[in-house]
């Protein structure tokens, strides 16, 4: 049974108040979010959050999750508002208590955000900025645990909640694949927008762009021109999509990578460690010499040329990478869509940002991208908390 109708009405009115508060106090909220995010990405995050809150009633009607007592959330270090909506606000429709441990990387901003949201509506959530050990003690017998972050860390934390439904939200390679039939101008604009979301500091940003060798020169020329038009400056100024990075150590990581790839840089390449800044940079490789593809968390565009689409499929499905499959954006290669759908959530002629919907399952089929664990059984699939709660607790 879900909450009785009267109780559900109270919960929905609470979310209505939250939506109203976000809209009314948007300037204050933007001031908080732009401590970490660029102004434009913060605005996009607010709009996505409102859209998800507006879809909450339909979501819980669709999946019909039963009432549970407690969710423990190991919160993300980025997209703080949107994550809060997904992991706390929406679950408040079917969960009595939500305990949140903020990421230490974004602690002060998360405290401000939590205080702001609690002023708008009395969501049954508590923010607990304490150690993992103390949080585990306080979380007690949680019905559900939500963990974002490092895959290896998730496995360690999961072992401490053997009875809980454990949901892991991670990251992936998120390739763009651009074929001979692609609309290059459109593909380039979406490629840039996806890579520079919050200056590249997002786990959905693409980390590699596979481009058919016959389209290489045209794509690179278009891509570089689109990059040249980007506004650069302080993150809290509207229109500035590239800014100094927020998270410590990212510019050092980028510098190390770009030093290794210096002979392949065709645009950009400057790094300023003193302000944690990485210039938008284009690196070009062939598939044979691709090297390691890492999660940059900064505006590096790694363009990799290929001759045959099956080469790309084989590379993505290699044993050392198949567990990192989350999303793939396919442009002008319709025959690839079905080949990748068994392992990725696929966007055709769109980016992952274009298709994400907070009221529907999202993610890939690699354990390092996302998984659900219950009673010792690990399964990777696109996740949505209400759906997973319904599947496990609705059986009782």
Question: What residues fall within each predicted segment?
Answer:
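Short glycine-enriched loop/turn motifs at secondary-structure junctions
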Residues: 139-140, 170-172, 202-205, 238-240, ...
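Short, well-ordered alpha-helix to beta-strand connector turns
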Residues: 141-143, 163, 206, 262, ...
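Conserved C-terminal structural/oligomerization subdomain of aldehyde/semialdehyde dehydrogenase
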Residues: 1-19, 114, 119-120, 277-396
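N-terminal Rossmann-like NAD(P)+-binding subdomain of aldehyde/semialdehyde dehydrogenases
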Residues: 1-70, 83, 90
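Short, charged/polar "capping" segments at the starts of alpha-helices
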Residues: 106-112, 217-218, 334-339
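ALDH superfamily catalytic-core signature
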Residues: 8, 118-122, 153-285
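Rossmann-like NAD(P) dinucleotide-binding subdomain of oxidoreductase/dehydrogenase enzymes
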Residues: 23, 58-186, 348
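Residue-level signal for inorganic ion chemistry
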Residues: 95, 145, 178, 212, ...
């Amino acid at each position: 049974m879900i909450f009785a109708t009267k109780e559900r009405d109270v919960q929905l009115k609470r979310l209505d108040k939250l939506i109203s508060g976000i809209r009314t106090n948007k300037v204050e909220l933007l001031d908080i979010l732009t401590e970490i995010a660029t102004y434009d990405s913060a605005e996009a995050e607010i709009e996505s959050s409102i859209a998800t809150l507006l879809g909450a009633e339909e979501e819980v009607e669709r999946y019909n999750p039963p009432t549970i007592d407690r969710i423990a959330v190991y919160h993300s270090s980025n997209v703080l508002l949107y994550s809060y909506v997904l992991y706390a606000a929406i679950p408040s429709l079917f969960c009595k208590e939500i305990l949140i441990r903020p990421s230490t990387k974004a602690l002060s901003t998360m405290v401000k955000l939590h205080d702001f949201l609690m002023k708008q509506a009395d969501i049954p959530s508590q923010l607990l900025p304490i150690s993992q050990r103390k949080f585990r003690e306080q979380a007690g017998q949680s019905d559900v645990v939500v963990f974002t972050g490092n895959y290896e860390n998730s496995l360690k934390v999961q072992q401490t909640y053997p009875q809980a439904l454990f949901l892991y939200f991670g990251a992936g390679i998120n390739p763009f694949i651009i074929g001979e039939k692609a609309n290059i101008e459109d593909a380039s604009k979406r490629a840039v927008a996806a890579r520079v979301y919050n200056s590249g500091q997002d786990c959905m940003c693409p980390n590699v762009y596979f481009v058919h060798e016959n389209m290489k020169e045209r794509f690179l020329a278009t891509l570089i021109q689109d990059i040249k038009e980007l506004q650069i400056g302080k993150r809290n100024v509207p229109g500035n999509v590239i800014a100094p990075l927020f998270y410590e150590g990212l510019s050092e990581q980028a510098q190390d990578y770009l030093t290794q790839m210096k002979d392949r840089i065709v645009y950009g390449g400057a790094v300023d460690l003193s302000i944690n800044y990485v210039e938008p940079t284009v690196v070009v490789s062939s598939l044979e010499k691709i090297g390691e593809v890492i999660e940059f968390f900064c505006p590096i565009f790694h363009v990799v040329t290929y001759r045959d689409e099956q080469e790309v499929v084989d590379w993505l499905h290699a044993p050392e990478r198949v567990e990192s499959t989350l999303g793939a954006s396919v442009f002008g290669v319709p025959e690839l869509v079905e080949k990748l759908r068994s392992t990725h959530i696929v966007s055709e002629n769109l980016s992952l940002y274009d298709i994400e919907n907070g009221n529907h399952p999202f993610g890939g089929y690699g354990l390092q991208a996302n998984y659900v664990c219950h009673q010792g059984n690990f399964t990777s699939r696109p996740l949505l908390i209400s759906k997973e709660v319904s599947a496990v607790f609705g059986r009782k």
